[in-house]
């Protein structure tokens, strides 16, 4: 197996399993063919890559992820396909896309259930952990750096821009009053204490949008997505397809416009493909998923 992955992590300690969102729709959308070469730029635990490898004979996959834990888990989960898969440790924005190479490219955006379940990664406000939120732990900026060092106006701006949080100024003011904040639960408590009771006990936890904003900033997600959308189409062979799954409007809007505005692509999904009720009942995360597909012009 070709691999750029060299890490001493214990495979048995990992719980990186991933239920593939819109799996059938992705395989149909990519039109996986025998002998094809496919690029999965967010391999995670390997769920979608497995479906691609199983969809036709002699398929090859190049699997990219910026999280070393994910690559270790995918390496283990897909060991039976070791002669047909190559793992690369990289953010998809930094990946050097070889021109006219792939029959299909897949990106499954956003945070995985693994990241939310692993308290020490700092993505979830439901368990106490250090304010980290780095997908790639080689990055220097953490959520704690942002929360404790950025000024009130900057915090309010990112909460509004990347979390679409209407109470961004009020929340930023309370955070500045209470900092330094070191853990996810300390931050969540500060946020909850800054909002009206009806907001505090609503269906969505008041920290949800702030945590989304911090994750986007720490991982530079939207800039990375913009770079990916610019670079990826050239890596497709003529007639090759790109499939992108997004989970909120801040992701879906640039995907929609990026695919539509690329001179190399023809959009195949007039409206995004969404999960059916059966999938939603089995995997609630799929409720907000939107799949868009485009094909490279000949």
From Swiss-Prot:
Its EC number is 2.1.1.199. It holds the Pfam family Methyltransf_5. It comes from the Bacteria. S-adenosyl-L-methionine binds at residues 46-48, 65, 92, 108, 115. One of its GO terms (cellular component) is cytoplasm. GO terms for biological process: rRNA base methylation. It catalyses: cytidine(1402) in 16S rRNA + S-adenosyl-L-methionine = N(4)-methylcytidine(1402) in 16S rRNA + S-adenosyl-L-homocysteine + H(+). Keywords: Cytoplasm, Methyltransferase, rRNA processing, S-adenosyl-L-methionine, Transferase. GO terms for molecular function: rRNA (cytosine-N4-)-methyltransferase activity. The keyword S-adenosyl-L-methionine applies. It is found in: Cytoplasm. The keyword Heme does not apply. Belongs to the methyltransferase superfamily. RsmH family. Specifically methylates the N4 position of cytidine in position 1402 (C1402) of 16S rRNA. PANTHER family: 12S RRNA N4-METHYLCYTIDINE METHYLTRANSFERASE, S-ADENOSYL-METHYLTRANSFERASE MRAW. This is Ribosomal RNA small subunit methyltransferase H. It comes from Nostoc punctiforme (strain ATCC 29133 / PCC 73102). The lineage of its organism: Bacteria, Bacillati, Cyanobacteriota, Cyanophyceae, Nostocales.
